[in-house]
């Protein structure tokens, strides 16, 4: 099977936005106009093509980034629809890793919102070129220039309109192209028929003004164009487009477009802009990787002739075909039925079938080419972030970093039959989502699940019940506290057991001290003269690390400490690894009374957006939750409160905010750092945990 679309005519894009900016609807329209769907599904009717999990259709939000493929003007566009809710930023992070470009969708009334800032920052980290689509121009309060301004004010982005709307709200009739200076008027409800006319007289001045400042902004990124501009020479449309493309690819400039996906206006022009300004796989630098075992850096250019390399960026359990692994091919080609190497796990994998995904329907293909996104059936050992490569040309591509979960709940099966099913289902869900963890509490035997927020865990439990038919009861959410030391001390750990026959003997002196915040655990061996034999040193480190998992104060993991092993003794016959492991854990317990242990709680960065009149109530509420207000700013007609609040005080906040603001307030929160818990609360937690 020959390649249908050349690499130069391929685009891998993501669509990213704040929740409710109209991202899924925009994707729907793209699929409609590119001939992939025959009937348009509305998100608010729960019938959207991309939102294919039942929970997504009910809640009207996008949870998993479904990958789909479409064709436009003899190009292939692979689209990844990413979720806009902050609990799912891992999905965004994961998809940005494999994209070449992105469309940021903004709400024309609100402009840049908190989650837009989060995904924008993530896209900047990965150097992803972006165009901006200002959606909902038909909405009451829509203001194109205000929304464009928020890109500069809130994100510091060099963003500039390359289009302007004709009218707004109910009077939104068409779009002016600021490059060609043509006006497009829409003639039917589906937006499939439009006609090009002259710019209406009342818009002419504004259009010319915006075009002049567009040329100026683009000229600043291109020396040749700057010279022409300064010398007053005419700049042709083609020159302008080429310069915009180059500046966009360099992530120096962001073209801004407008429309209303719901009213079917502006989507085709936005698709044109995807082809005109966003990169093909050949426009982005070749991906870097290392050769396993040597740490030698190599690059894998986008080409079918290079050795095969791909990154698995999502694993899903599909009711029909089982485990589906989504991957992006960076170089070479992959045939179904072939063998590849998972270089991260050093495992050989057989690729059963290769599927090209379209939201939740699929088409089987025999070969995936470089630059393409597809899904494989039959990979047993591959998880998110793993590299798949040619067995003779091993490489490990840059992987992804995922945040630690911050919230946990206990979950119990309803019946004995549910118990076995639950274990299998939870491990499948954990395989799909690296920010979801499942573990068994060794003391209580309870199953604990952890994730990025209440909504995240709600949806996991929901999926257990629906997809895996597991009956389960969920406890109250628990905060993932941590412990650390504030003081340092030298302590002894001695484990001696002599009771006839071979005994046990391990003896260590360890200095424990605080480490820098975020530096983790550090172990230093300062043994001189073999007072603790070399072969037992790893056991000492292991003994300390294993004990750290259960802390010294209230049973929470100890973090950011340094342990220096500097003295000890051993017995020729009775010493062994186990004895030194136990001695090391005894030393850690002895440090409890000397190293001033403290409890740390996760602090969340919270942003609350509310109408002015509710400010007083919101500030009072944040303070009553032990929150620290960091700042306030006006955002359009609303006020934004930025604060740090302990996670333990944020449970049920969504409900409180709704009732405090009559449903008009919204908030986002994500984990920021750990802070020492106040003494009274620490005592309460210690008592509670001791009493259990």
UniProtKB/Swiss-Prot annotation:
Residues 8-282 form the tr-type G domain. GO terms for biological process: ribosome disassembly. The keyword GTP-binding applies. Catalyzes the GTP-dependent ribosomal translocation step during translation elongation. During this step, the ribosome changes from the pre-translocational (PRE) to the post-translocational (POST) state as the newly formed A-site-bound peptidyl-tRNA and P-site-bound deacylated tRNA move to the P and E sites, respectively. Catalyzes the coordinated movement of the two tRNA molecules, the mRNA and conformational changes in the ribosome. Belongs to the TRAFAC class translation factor GTPase superfamily. Classic translation factor GTPase family. EF-G/EF-2 subfamily. HAMAP family: EF_G_EF_2_B. This is Elongation factor G. It comes from Oceanobacillus iheyensis (strain DSM 14371 / CIP 107618 / JCM 11309 / KCTC 3954 / HTE831). The lineage of its organism: Bacteria, Bacillati, Bacillota, Bacilli, Bacillales. The gene is fusA.
């Amino acid at each position: 099977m020959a390649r249908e679309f050349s690499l130069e005519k391929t685009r891998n894009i993501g669509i990213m936005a704040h929740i409710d900016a109209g991202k899924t609807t925009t994707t729907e329209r793209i699929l409609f106009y590119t001939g992939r769907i025959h009937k348009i599904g509305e998100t608010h009717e729960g019938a959207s093509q991309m939102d294919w999990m039942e929970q997504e259709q009910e809640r009207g939000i996008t949870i998993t980034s479904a990958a789909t493929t479409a064709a436009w003007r003899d190009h292939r566009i692979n689209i990844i629809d990413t979720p806009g809710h902050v609990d799912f930023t891992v999905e965004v992070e994961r998809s940005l890793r494999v994209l070449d470009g992105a469309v940021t969708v903004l709400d024309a009334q609100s402009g840049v919102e908190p989650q837009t800032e989060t995904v924008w920052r993530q896209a900047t980290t990965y150097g992803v070129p972006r165009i901006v689509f200002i959606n909902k121009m038909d909405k009451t309060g829509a203001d194109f220039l205000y929304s464009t301004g928020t890109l500069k004010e809130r994100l510091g982005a060099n963003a500039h309109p390359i289009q302007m709307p004709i009218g707004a709200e109910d009077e939104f009739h068409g779009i002016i192209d600021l490059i060609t200076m043509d006006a497009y008027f829409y003639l039917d409800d589906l937006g499939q028929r439009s006609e090009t006319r002259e710019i209406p007289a009342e818009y002419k001045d504004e259009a010319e003004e915006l075009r002049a400042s567009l040329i100026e902004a683009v000229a600043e990124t291109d020396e040749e164009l700057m010279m022409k501009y300064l010398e007053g020479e005419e700049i042709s449309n083609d020159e302008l487009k080429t310069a915009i493309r180059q500046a966009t690819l360099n992530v120096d400039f962001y073209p801004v477009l407008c429309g209303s996906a719901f009213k079917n206006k502006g989507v085709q022009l936005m698709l044109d802009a995807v082809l005109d300004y966003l990169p093909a796989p050949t426009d982005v630098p070749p991906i870097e990787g290392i050769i396993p075992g040597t740490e030698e850096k190599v690059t894998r250019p986008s080409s079918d002739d290079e050795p095969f390399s791909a990154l698995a960026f999502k694993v899903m359990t599909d009711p029909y075909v089982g485990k589906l692994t989504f991957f992006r091919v960076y170089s070479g080609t992959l045939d179904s039925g072939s063998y590849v190497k998972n270089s991260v796990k050093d495992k050989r994998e057989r690729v059963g079938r290769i599927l090209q995904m379209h939201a939740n329907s699929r088409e089987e293909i025999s070969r995936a080419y470089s630059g393409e996104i597809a899904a494989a059936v039959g990979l047993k050992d591959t998880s998110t972030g793993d590299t798949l490569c040619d067995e003779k040309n091993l490489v490990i591509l840059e992987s992804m970093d995922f945040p630690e979960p911050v919230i946990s709940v206990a979950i119990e099966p309803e019946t004995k039959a549910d118990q076995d099913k639950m274990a299998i289902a939870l491990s499948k869900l954990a395989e799909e989502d690296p920010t979801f963890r499942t573990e068994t509490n060794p003391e209580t035997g309870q199953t604990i699940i952890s994730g990025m927020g209440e909504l995240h865990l709600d949806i996991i439990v929901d999926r257990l019940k629906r997809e895996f038919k597991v009956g389960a009861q969920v406890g109250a959410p628990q905060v993932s506290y941590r412990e650390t030391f504030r003081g340092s001390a030298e302590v002894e750990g001695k484990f001696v057991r002599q009771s006839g026959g071979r005994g046990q003997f391990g003896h260590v002196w360890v200095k424990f001290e605080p480490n820098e915040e975020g530096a983790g655990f550090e172990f230093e061996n300062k043994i001189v003269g073999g007072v603790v034999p070399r072969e037992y040193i790893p056991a000492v480190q292991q003994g300390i690390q294993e004990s750290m998992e259960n802390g010294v104060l209230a049973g929470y993991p100890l973090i950011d400490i340094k342990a220096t092993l500097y003295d000890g003794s051993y017995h020729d016959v009775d010493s062994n690894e186990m004895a030194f492991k136990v001695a090391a854990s005894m030393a850690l317990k002895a440090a409890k009374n000397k190293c001033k242990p403290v409890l740390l709680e996760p602090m969340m960065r919270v942003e609350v957006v509310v109408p002015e009149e509710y400010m007083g109530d919101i500030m009072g509420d944040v303070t009553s939750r032990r929150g620290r207000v960091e700042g306030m700013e006006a955002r359009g007609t609303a006020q934004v409160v930025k604060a740090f609040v302990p996670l333990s005080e944020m449970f049920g906040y969504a409900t409180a905010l709704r009732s405090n603001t009559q449903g008009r307030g919204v908030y986002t929160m994500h984990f920021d750092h750990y802070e020492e818990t106040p003494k009274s609360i620490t005592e309460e937690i210690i008592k509670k945990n001791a009493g259990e």
